Swiss-Prot record:
Its EC number is 4.2.1.96. Belongs to the pterin-4-alpha-carbinolamine dehydratase family. The keyword Lyase applies. Keywords: Lyase. GO terms for molecular function: 4-alpha-hydroxytetrahydrobiopterin dehydratase activity. It comes from Rubrobacter xylanophilus (strain DSM 9941 / JCM 11954 / NBRC 16129 / PRD-1). It catalyses: (4aS,6R)-4a-hydroxy-L-erythro-5,6,7,8-tetrahydrobiopterin = (6R)-L-erythro-6,7-dihydrobiopterin + H2O. This is Putative pterin-4-alpha-carbinolamine dehydratase.
């Protein structure tokens, strides 16, 4: 499991550049199953046996988001959920996005 999950999400104050290049790739290697899309956001799809399992998972992600004060975009339906993570304030990726994704993997 990634050591990223041991960290905490840090609120972004803005004015920092989004992660790019080697640093982005280094962090992405620690999150198998997550896709880096256009160097802008992280995305992962999850499958479940039914609607209730998907809903329970989404609720746990929501609780994590509130605890970490880092809020993903969530899309879900019968037997599936998709989580998209990026830092809205800078419209790109920060280390906190990778931390959050690693924490989602622990749910």
């Amino acid at each position: 499991m990634s050591e990223l999950a041991e960290k905490e999400c840090v609120p972004c104050k803005g004015g920092v550049p989004p992660l790019k290049g080697e640093e982005l790739e280094r962090l992405a290697r620690q999150l198998p199953g997550w896709e880096v899309v256009d160097e802008h956001h992280l995305r992962r799809s999850f499958r479940f046996r039914n609607f209730r399992e998907a809903l329970d998972f989404v609720n746990r992600v929501g609780e994590l988001a509130e605890e970490q004060n880092h809020h993903p975009d969530i899309c879900f339906g019968w037997g599936r959920a998709e989580i998209t993570v990026f830092t809205h304030k800078i419209d790109g990726l920060t280390e906190s996005d990778f931390v959050f994704a690693a924490k989602v993997d622990r749910l």
